Amino acid sequence: MDKLFSMIEVEVNSQCNRTCWYCPNSVSKRKETGEMDPALYKTLMEQLSSLDFAGRISFHFYGEPLLCKNLDLFVGMTTEYIPRARPIIYTNGDFLTEKRLQTLTELGIQKFIVTQHAGAKHKFRGVYDQLAGADKEKVVYLDHSDLVLSNRGGILDNIPQASKANMSCMVPSNLAVVTVLGNVLPCFEDFNQKMVMGNIGEQHISDIWHNDKFTSFRKMLKEGHRGKSDLCKNCNNVSVQTEEQYDYVL
């Protein structure tokens, strides 16, 4: 039986205030919109608690988590149900004030990955410069030029489509994505939800992770057969080649 995922990304909301040219939000709309129902989030927490999940959990897919009205509730529930997990927030920083950072830290967030995206002046720069040492240590502050851009599974035409068809990918061996409506995806590149593996409202996430569809997909990607999947055949992302847990890839 395959080992359990060490990372889980939860789409607590679908909205983003930016439409960066290197993000699918600039060319398409998510199939699922809105915010996750707190009852569904609780279901996920109960399932992860039963697994004693101790990996990385983050609160995004292609949305900006600080726009989620229930973010504080979700972070608090995470700390309550899975205290050994590592809660991390990935954000564009536009709504991250010093007070907000401190509140979320008190609720359990261990790290903030803030990316200064292309476009409008970044408000967070001034906040970051004024942070005390202990708070600043919780922030990884990146410029968009630091990022290794992918074509998001072939969605973005403005990023080279050159396929890495024979290269392995360990993303579905390490990570699960849970969408606003509870659908489980095998990859953070699956913006259009081509590979739904199950739904946490209908099955335990462990059962979904170990089902035949997910297991076969993992094996295929480990062996480098990207060309057999519509999701992967045009993907140029080769950043995840090991089963090690990571916070971000440069």
UniProtKB/Swiss-Prot annotation:
Mutation effect (residue 68 to A): Soluble protein
Pfam family, one: Radical_SAM
Tagged with keyword Oxidoreductase: yes
Keywords: 4Fe-4S, Antibiotic biosynthesis, Iron, Iron-sulfur, Metal-binding, Oxidoreductase, S-adenosyl-L-methionine
Sequence positions that bind [4Fe-4S] cluster 2: 169, 187, 223
Needed cofactors: [4Fe-4S] cluster
Pathway this chain belongs to: Antibiotic biosynthesis; butirosin biosynthesis
Catalytic activity annotation: 2-deoxy-scyllo-inosamine + S-adenosyl-L-methionine = 3-amino-2,3-dideoxy-scyllo-inosose + 5'-deoxyadenosine + L-methionine + H(+)
Purpose: Catalyzes the radical S-adenosyl-L-methionine (SAM)-dependent two-electron oxidation of 2-deoxy-scyllo-inosamine (DOIA) to amino-dideoxy-scyllo-inosose (amino-DOI) in the biosynthetic pathway of butirosin.
Gene3D superfamilies associated with the record: Aldolase class I (3.20.20.70)
Protein name: S-adenosyl-L-methionine-dependent 2-deoxy-scyllo-inosamine dehydrogenase
One BP annotation, GO: antibiotic biosynthetic process
UniProt-reported outcome of changing residue 169 to A: Insoluble protein
Example of a GO MF term: metal ion binding
Family: Belongs to the radical SAM superfamily.
NCBIfam families: rSAM_more_4Fe4S (TIGR04085)
Cofactor binding remark: Binds 2 [4Fe-4S] clusters. One cluster is coordinated with 3 cysteines and an exchangeable S-adenosyl-L-methionine. A second auxiliary cluster is also in contact with the substrate and is proposed to facilitate the loss of the second electron in the oxidation.
SUPFAM superfamilies in the record: Radical SAM enzymes
